[in-house]
Structures are given as structure tokens and as C-alpha cells.
Amino acid sequence: MIITTTPAIEGKNILEYKGVVFGEVISGVNFIKDFAAGLSNFFGGRSNTYEDELIGAREKAMKEMENRAIQMGANAVVGVDIDYEVLGSDNGMLMVTASGTAVYCE
């Protein structure tokens, strides 16, 4: 499946617009990850713990969006946008939303 941030796919004609499609993931960040990330930040390094969590959440949201597009009969998703939001009273949750337009192209 072609997934792109552009509104069209070069060299392909969009034959049918299936509709807007979403993929959402909410991921909690636990105490051990917070502690490891805090040490990394203290010593001036990058927080691989949080980066890995972010990458994993983004990949899951994209896959969920792709699966929903397939269920709609699409073979591509155009105009993809990914949003990130921190949730919870202690900012302990990360929400990643992938959205786009499911299309059928030649």
C-alpha cells in the first residue's frame, strides 16, 4: 500500500476517494522509563527510551490507519498527517494519531 503525505501520487490516477481514515494509539510511559530517561537527560544524552516509545507508537498508528484503509477497499492513503499529544494529569500518556484520505488508484 502506498502511504504518502502528498495529496496525489505521481504517475498514478486516483480513481475513487474512499474517505478519511484514522489510526490512533495511546501509550503510557512508566516509572522505569521515566527514570532511565531522566538519567539520560541529566547527563546530556538523548533519551532512547522515549524515542523508542515514540517510534513504536507512530508505527502502530500508521499500521492501524493502513488496516482501516484496506477495510474500506483502498490501495493507498494520501495527505497523511501525524499528530502527537501528551495526555493525563501527570503527562504520563502519549497519543499518536495518523490521518489521511483512503483512495483507490490505478
Curated annotation (Swiss-Prot):
Belongs to the UPF0145 family. Disulfide bonds: none annotated. This is UPF0145 protein CLH_2273. NCBIfam families: PRK01119.1. It comes from the Bacteria. Coiled coil: none annotated. Pfam families: YbjQ_1 (PF01906).
